[in-house]
Regions:
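Short acidic/histidine-rich active-site segments
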Residues: 189-192
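Short gly/pro/ser/thr-enriched loop/turn and capping motifs at secondary-structure boundaries
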Residues: 142, 168-170
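Metallo-beta-lactamase
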Residues: 7-16, 148-155, 163-166
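Short loop-to-alpha-helix "cap/lid" segments that border enzyme active sites
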Residues: 173-183
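Active-site metal-binding loops of divalent metal-dependent hydrolases
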Residues: 6, 42-43, 83-84, 138, ...
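An N-terminally biased module of ancient metal coordination in phosphate/nucleic-acid-related enzymes
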Residues: 1-74
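Non-catalytic positions within long, well-ordered alpha-helices that form the structural scaffold/packing
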Residues: 30, 127, 184-185
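Extended substrate/RNA-proximal surfaces in nucleic-acid metabolism proteins
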Residues: 48-162, 176
Length: 192
């Protein structure tokens, strides 16, 4: 099984805070049957403003983690990727760090309380460049909680939808859980 959206590499963003925390996360993942993880460090997000989020730094963190994993006999493969914060510049930042699947996909996160109207054109422009947008955890966005038709618009525009497993369990709040369940019921998501 592949964990598609994870912040496992230490000290890069608001995910793992230490090597020990990353190893604990990996032990849990292994117990759950996960064999591969796509690390999706935040990119151009206000949470990481001013931090060095580069392919080199991510690779260094992964190698450090691999060394420690080998000592514990953990053999989960970690792929490098990002969760790109929506700004109108998405087409201009297509590169190996901001995309995955050989440049074919970009995981995109919006503000929890606002989905800009301009995003429709930006997502279309990404598609025209051969990059399929994957909308990260839409069930957590207030505009989607209030109007699920936004998910249909994204799907009709060729986007894919990724839900957060924590939303389905209720650990991210009741509104996210209700919206996630509705998205699943309507068969609108491709990744959990």
């Amino acid at each position: 099984m592949i964990d598609f959206h994870n912040h496992i590499l230490p000290d890069l963003d608001d995910g793992s805070k230490s090597l020990e925390m990353s190893l604990a996360m990996l032990r849990t993942a292994a117990d759950q049957g996960i064999t591969e993880i796509i690390n999706t460090v935040h990119f151009q997000h206000p949470k990481v403003d001013g931090m060095d989020i580069s392919m080199e730094r991510c690779s260094e963190k992964r190698e450090l983690l691999y060394d420690e994993m080998a000592k514990e006999g953990l053999s989960i493969k970690i792929h490098l990727g990002t969760e790109v914060f929506y700004l109108p510049n998405l087409v201009d930042i297509i590169n190996p760090l901001t995309t995955f699947g050989h440049g074919k996909y970009m995981l995109i996160e919006f503000l929890s309380h606002q989905i800009p109207d301009a995003q429709q054109q930006v997502l279309f422009d990404l598609k025209m460049k051969g990059v399929t947008p994957i909308i990260a955890h839409p069930e957590r966005y207030k505009p989607v909680q209030e109007n699920i038709s936004l998910v249909y618009k994204w799907l009709n525009a060729g986007c894919l939808i990724q839900l957060d497993a924590g939303s389905l369990t209720g650990s991210l709040g009741n509104s996210a859980r209700i919206t996630a369940m509705e998205i699943v019921k309507r068969k609108l998501c491709q990744f959990i």
